[in-house]
Regions:
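Residues lining hydrophobic/aromatic ligand-binding pockets adjacent to catalytic sites
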Residues: 3-6, 10-197
C-alpha cells in the first residue's frame, strides 16, 4: 500500500540520519558473500573484533586472507580484537567460566576500543565491526558493544544480508523476548553463551 511504503521510506531516511556503526558476522559465508554484504552498505572500514582472528573451519576468514580480500575491494581492514574481543585475556572478566559483560565493559582496554569506534564515527567513516557469529543475538556485538555504543549516542546496525539489516533495538527485543534491557531487576545482565575457563 502507498501509506505503508511512505512510512517505510520515512523510517529508512530517519535511520540513515542517526549516528551509527555497522556490525556483521561471517558465520559460514563465503568471502564474496561477505564482501557483497559490506558493499551493499558502502562500508569503508572493516574492524575485526574477534579475539582470535582465524577460523578453523572457514580459513578464508583467517586474518591475513580476510585483510587481503576486503582490501582488494577497497575496504580497509583493521584489527581490534585485543580491545573489543569477546574472549578477553583478562581473567577477571569471567564469572563461573563465562565472560561477564558487566565486568568487561568497565575495563580500560574495552573503553579504549569504544573510544576508537566513536572517533571513527565522529569523522564520518562508514565502519563495520566483524565477529564470527552470523546471528547478532548470539554475539557480544549486540549484547555488549551495541549496548555500550547506544549509551554514547551511536546505534549499532547489524548487517544480516545484502541490503538487509536489523537495528540494535530489534536484536535486543528478540534477545530479551520483548522485555528490553530493563527488567524488574534493573539492567539486563548479559554473559557469553558458553563457558571458556
Amino acid at each position: 500500500c502507498y501509506f505503508c511504503n511512505s512510512i517505510e521510506s520515512i523510517q529508512k531516511e530517519y535511520m540513515e540520519q542517526l549516528s551509527h556503526i555497522f556490525s556483521i558476522g561471517h558465520g559460514s559465508k563465503d568471502i564474496k558473500e561477505l564482501i557483497l554484504e559490506l558493499q551493499s552498505f558502502d562500508i569503508e572500514f572493516l574492524v575485526d573484533i574477534r579475539s582470535k582472528p582465524y577460523s578453523k573451519f572457514y580459513t578464508h576468514f583467517n586474518q591475513g586472507f580476510l585483510k587481503y580480500s576486503v582490501e582488494e575491494y577497497h575496504i580497509k581492514y583493521g584489527y581490534m580484537g585485543d580491545l573489543l574481543g569477546g574472549l578477553p585475556l583478562d581473567r577477571t572478566c569471567y564469572t563461573d567460566g563465562k565472560v561477564d559483560y558487566n565486568k568487561l565493559k568497565n575495563r580500560e582496554f574495552f573503553i579504549e576500543g569504544l573510544k576508537r569506534l566513536q572517533n571513527a564515527n565522529s569523522k564520518g567513516f562508514n565502519v563495520c565491526i566483524l565477529c564470527s557469529e552470523s546471528n547478532p543475538k548470539e554475539c557480544h556485538r549486540a549484547k555488549l558493544i551495541g549496548v555500550e555504543l547506544q549509551k554514547m549516542g551511536i546505534e549499532l546496525r547489524h548487517i544480516i544480508g545484502i541490503e538487509k539489516e536489523k537495528t540494535q533495538n530489534q536484536v535486543i527485543f528478540e534477545l530479551t523476548n520483548g522485555d528490553g534491557l530493563n527488567t524488574i531487576f534493573g539492567e539486563e545482565h548479559f554473559t557469553s553463551r558458553k563457558k571458556y575457563i
